[in-house]
Amino acid sequence: MAFRHITKEDLTSRLEDPQLFIIDLRSNWENSTLKIRRARRETPEDTNLWLADYPKKSEIVLYCSSPGEKDSLRIAEILSAAGFENVSVLSGGWAVWETAGLPMEKRISDPLSKGVVPNVGKP
């Protein structure tokens, strides 16, 4: 199935659209510092666990760093089969966005993902 591709220019112009969900499919080490502004990190291997978090009628833009947007296209296929109607893939993925210096933000680190366990309940 062919999915719509969205250009970096089109995505930039829509970054503040509250109906738009931008999903970062890169691996943890790839997205450890920066991501596209407003993007949410989702694990491709756990797609069936997180797809219910998104309204099926909303617009979803996927991006990754795999050659030819391979990971984004694979997840777009899964979302489409699950009834999502408006799924796009960022043309050129993360590399195009980063090279162009478009709006990015620092990823909020999760202490548990780095093996740091907070001292809960200890003095």
Region locations from a protein language model:
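Rhodanese-like catalytic fold shared by cysteine-dependent sulfurtransferases
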Residues: 1-16, 20-21, 28-61, 66-123
